[in-house]
Amino acid sequence: MASTKEKLIAHVSKEQPAGPTNKVTVVGVGMVGMAAAVSILLKDLTDELALVDVMEDKLKGEAMDLQHGSLFLKTHKIVADKDYSVTANSKVVVVTAGARQQEGESRLNLVQRNVNIFKFIIPNIIKYSPNCILLVVSNPVDILTYVAWKLSGLPRNRVIGSGTNLDSARFRYLMGEKLGIHPSSCHGWVVGEHGDSSVPVWSGVNVAGVSLQALNPDLGTDKDKEDWKSVHKMVVDSAYEVIKLKGYTSWAIGMSVADLCESILKNMHKCHPVSTLVKGMHGVNEEVFLSVPCILGNNGLTDVVHMTLKPEEEKQLVKSAETLWGVQKELTL
């Protein structure tokens, strides 16, 4: 006897099974992972989303919750499992898993705890998606991007840290608040470490091509009567402030991740401040990952933009590198 489905549908041709073309995996279904997953779904970036976590009940619950919203999405397949085989053939793998940053804890304090987690995660990702682009979000992101690069064996263009993409977004938002202008019209870059020793490039801050430093030569210095330096201080303090108020950060970093995924999956050749290997650049001699302006496309990180930094900015960048290297060289990989 024919089933309801057979009575309803008349097959015209046999469907040829085809794999996903823009599959994205998110490893870790905590607050950041789910904010990233939702942001990716709402941007219609992927034809298949895979979620992975060791906490099976939470993983299943988050996946079901997203699947129940399928009517409102254009991603037709959302899958989840603690087994990494579910991630097979991913174009981009977003790694958010790791120990959560506690109130008042620096990102660098998190490091060895998360390195040990990465020793399990990264080989499993590569086993099932050897051609993927790794986007590392877990903190401390610059060191863990280096760790992912070492553990994965992937070329440097395919291991990217979310870096200061969010720091720069925070900077532009706060700059816009000070000027009464939308952040998209406020241009400024925060480079270096994602976190406490990040470097604001005051020499490049502009609106409509008008350099703010040309209008205010003391911009960003202690002599500045308008105290623009406090804008960067607020960028550095903002994560700690949000954690203090709500216990974690999630939405802004989730949107930042989706922004980076869009540039990769749509081959946009867009410039982002993301974490990459900077040895040999700007006086950095150590094998460290720091954020500099990079072009992102289908092959991952395709180019690095040569910034013109003032001596004091370059000095800060080198100091950032030395801070990270001091921690990195002690790691057990």
Curated annotation (Swiss-Prot):
Cell compartment(s), UniProt: Cytoplasm
Reaction(s) catalysed by this chain's protein: (S)-lactate + NAD(+) = pyruvate + NADH + H(+)
Enzyme class: oxidoreductase
Family per similarity comment: Belongs to the LDH/MDH superfamily. LDH family.
One GO cellular component term noted in the UniProt record for this chain: mitochondrion
Protein name listed in UniProt: L-lactate dehydrogenase A chain
Gene source species: Danio rerio (Zebrafish)
Catalytic site: H194 (proton acceptor)
UniProt keyword list: Cytoplasm, NAD, Oxidoreductase
Enzyme Commission identifier(s): 1.1.1.27
